[in-house]
């Protein structure tokens, strides 16, 4: 069993400086990946625009990690889906792309 997180920024289309927001998201997720590397099965990855996702190991605490991201993004708000389930494909550890299974289905 794994824990999938799928998130996106709220109201990003209305941001005055989308590039600055994207840079803040990227640097926050890179720092998060380093800080929580032992809990991640696949690193946080920006997928499309302002969406990001990760795959956590079963013992990880997704709420702790999401709270950390929220604190470090400061003024940027986001929403997340959390899914617990199986992964039926190979897991690429350095990015949360290409994986499939009920963990991601449930997070949507």
Question: What do the predicted segments below correspond to?
Answer:
Residues 1-108:
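Regulatory and interdomain segments flanking nucleotide-handling catalytic cores
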């Amino acid at each position: 069993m794994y824990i999938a997180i799928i998130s996106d920024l709220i109201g990003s289309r209305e941001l005055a400086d989308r590039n600055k927001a994207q840079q803040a998201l990227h640097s926050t997720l890179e720092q998060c990946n380093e800080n929580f590397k032992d809990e991640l099965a696949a690193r946080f990855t920006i997928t499309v625009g302002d969406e990001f996702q990760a795959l956590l190991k079963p013992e990880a605490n997704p709420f702790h990690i999401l709270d950390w991201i929220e604190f470090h993004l400061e003024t940027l708000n986001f929403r997340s889906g959390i899914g617990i389930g199986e992964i039926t494909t190979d897991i690429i550890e350095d990015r949360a792309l290409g994986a499939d299974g009920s963990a991601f289905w449930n997070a949507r």
